[in-house]
Amino acid sequence: MKILYLINHAGKAGTEKYVLNLVERYNEREAKCYFAYNEPGLLSEQMAERKISTFQFEMKNPYDIKAAKVLSRICRENKIDIIHAQYPRECYIAVLSKLFYKKTKIVFTSHLTLSNSIAWKITNRLITPFVDRVISVCNSGKELLINNGYPKKKIDVIYNGVIPSGGKREKSTIREELGISEDTFVITTLARLHYSKGLEFLIDSIEKLDRIIKRNYVLLIGGDGELYDELKNRIEDKGLSEKIKLLGFRKDAYNILCGSDIYVNSSMCLEALSFAILEALNASLPTVATNVGGNGDIINENTGCGKIVEYGDTDAMANAIYELSENSEYLEKGRENCIKTINEVFNLEKIFEDTFDVYKKVMGK
């Protein structure tokens, strides 16, 4: 089986991690993998390092006929069986490529939780008959896909996943690097510095936490983006420079997590199923997360891995963090539940099996 993974921006976010995981697992085992992209970044570098057959071409918009022709030529010359597209632009271009080469099947993974406009919904209904299967990475995403014009019978919910750590945490160097004492309560979030990640809301919540917490604490924000200066000024204006540290982009995410006590996700929108939360759980970190997208699939009463709060409720966010900082028994139980949940629900090997079952289904096997 020959599978081509199609993505516009080959960057360093969760979707790119999703694609890399699949390629690393399937290539030269169950399948021969190929990769096509438009804008270069970390993922395109990683594919080159792994010697994956790679193609770069411009994808201006979802209706880019020139891109569709290039894609069809790649599929014809390499006898591609399946295009696995990420995001709507890539999905539409994949469908248009079938005008020029009809043999390729199309699988589309939706990584977004956005309600489409009426125009998009109409177009979706025209396009989806030519999409063989749709994967949603969370349950709320599936409901939105149906609302956006995708047929329910074509949609499979397959969560993102990680390789279970079994509760083993590496010795972290982050506290020593930043001069953080062992008795300091370390709260961490790893996110692009983008409005959708709700970091202004998180900073405002920490301002309230600062008034009630009884122990030393620090919030570490790992990530880069266009809001860096704005967030830095906000932190300084609130007098929280000693309590909130902007770390910039880091390649040692697991090292940071292993030196932390809890994780927070403050997203306001666009969150499907967060890899960062899964990685935090894998490092035994109970998590406080906003009730958006697929966060509730991970953090809920059944999993017992932390607390869900409504976006914008700074009191709820501050109080949830405070409770975890003060209740050691609750914190320890949450750590145990994190490992159990990763093993049973978000185990990457299960995700590999379920995704390949989709490929076999579209190939009639």
Where would I find each of the regions flagged by the language model?
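Membrane-interface segments of envelope glycosyltransferases acting on lipid-linked substrates or membrane lipids
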Residues: 1-365
